[in-house]
Amino acid sequence: AFAGILADADITAALAACKAEGSFKHGEFFTKIGLKGKSAADIKKVFGIIDQDKSDFVEEDELKLFLQNFSAGARALTDAETATFLKAGDSDGDGKIGVDEFAAMVKG
């Protein structure tokens, strides 16, 4: 799904680094997968993949399964990790993350 945007080796390394429950840190993950240095267009493409229901927002249930976008066998985020991730990205407080909020969070 991320071919041409992100390298498989970077994704594998990033997933390995947050395998343990409670170890997911979005900033570190975005850096490890190489997303931080990507263009706005590429970040928007990644957002489109994560936005599974195509609502133009990433909601809490999609964040919980965030890692599974990168590997089907990846773990779900814990409730605490999901809440922290949502809070970090949801700058307008509407309970979901839009594409501009996502881009701002990635660039961090």
UniProtKB/Swiss-Prot annotation:
Is Thylakoid one of the keywords?
no
Task: Please give the PANTHER family that the UniProt record associates with this protein.
Answer: PARVALBUMIN, PARVALBUMIN ALPHA
What does this chain do? Answer: In muscle, parvalbumin is thought to be involved in relaxation after contraction. It binds two calcium ions.
Span of domain EF-hand: 38-73, 77-108
- Which CDD domains does the protein's record reference? EFh_parvalbumin_beta
InterPro entries from the xrefs? EF-hand-dom_pair (IPR011992), EF_Hand_1_Ca_BS (IPR018247), EF_hand_dom (IPR002048), Parvalbumin (IPR008080)
What GO cellular component is one of the record's annotations?
cytoplasm
| GO terms assigned for molecular function | calcium ion binding
Q: Where does Ca(2+) 2 bind?
A: 90, 92, 94, 96, 101
Q: Which Gene3D superfamilies match?
A: EF-hand
**Sites bearing N-acetylalanine, chain numbering:** 1
Protein name (record): Parvalbumin beta 2
Q: What else is known?
A: Is regarded as an important allergen.
Stated family: Belongs to the parvalbumin family.
Query: What Pfam family is a match, any one?
Result: EF-hand_7
Q: Where does Ca(2+) 1 bind?
A: 51, 53, 55, 57, 59, 62
Q: Which UniProt keywords apply?
A: Acetylation, Allergen, Calcium, Metal-binding, Muscle protein, Repeat
